[in-house]
């Protein structure tokens, strides 16, 4: 799988930009705030229907325009895909794949698979559990439509349960009983799928991490949840909801469930979030991203596109070398302010260079 072309109209700082991409390595070079990341953002949006930078779709529209248009042409082994997206300032959007209207975001996912690595991804390791849950949810939604459906349903019912906890009456226990049964069903599936994904990360990620660190470090991923027996997760979750109901009524919120879960990343049995150096934390994220690439490849039979947003300059030479030596079978789109540091590791015959300046792109 690879992206053949991207066409943007009124997207961020682009008026009307058509770009053909190499199936190998594409490098966009330019100063900051020229539009390099906007290219990656448009591709990422075409993949999952969301931006990695903003929750407001209207932010993607050029400031003096009423709508933006994105077209991404994707070459697949079985069937090529043309993804068209119109986003309007009133909050509406229209998406088609091969001219067929998409009604749900789950129908968009899987047509264009990408893995993005940006400096902000250090938050997966360093910051709150929400960042780690988000990572798991996005990666699982790419490869599992049932997971996406159950996650949406879980969050919807969770919101309704929390509203009921804030506005309870003498029928509150009957109402919460219904919510708890539904949450247990969807929540158990989410927990089990997250745990399975982390098992895959452990198998694949350990080998990747050893390559990056020359066998000096061992990485491990461990799911942190209240559930002890994954085979009976639904029953156990229902029991925990009932056990914590009094506390939930006092706090007006749901205190346990997959929306509270986390996962631990340890290197040589030490918690990387608390005790890891910045270099170790970057390496852990690198391992997560490259393991995610392999998991997608194993499931769908094709590598996703790899988007590297200004991250190579933050890696030392050993990690730069690992990245650039690992992408020969993967379409990779790189943004950077200069290629001097990575030039010696690039395969010139497999690389296409572009210069980006104030929303204009020049192929070199």
Swiss-Prot record:
InterPro entries linked to this entry: DNA-binding_RecF, DNA-binding_RecF_CS, P-loop_NTPase, RecF/RecN/SMC_N, RecF_2
A single cellular component GO annotation: cytoplasm
Keywords: ATP-binding, Cytoplasm, DNA damage, DNA repair, DNA replication, DNA-binding, Nucleotide-binding, SOS response
Domain of life of the organism encoding this protein: Bacteria
Binding-site positions, ATP: 30-37
Location relative to the cell: Cytoplasm
GO biological process, one term: DNA synthesis involved in DNA repair
GO MF term set: ATP binding; single-stranded DNA binding
Keyword ATP-binding among record annotations: yes
PANTHER family associated with the record: DNA REPLICATION AND REPAIR PROTEIN RECF
Entry-linked NCBIfam families: recf
Described purpose of this protein according to its UniProt entry: The RecF protein is involved in DNA metabolism; it is required for DNA replication and normal SOS inducibility. RecF binds preferentially to single-stranded, linear DNA. It also seems to bind ATP.
Protein family per UniProt: Belongs to the RecF family.
Protein name: DNA replication and repair protein RecF
Source species taxonomy: Bacteria, Bacillati, Bacillota, Clostridia, Eubacteriales
